[in-house]
């Protein structure tokens, strides 16, 4: 699962 980067 990819990291959530905002």
From Swiss-Prot:
Annotated protein name in UniProt: Peptide 2
Species of the source: Crocodylus siamensis
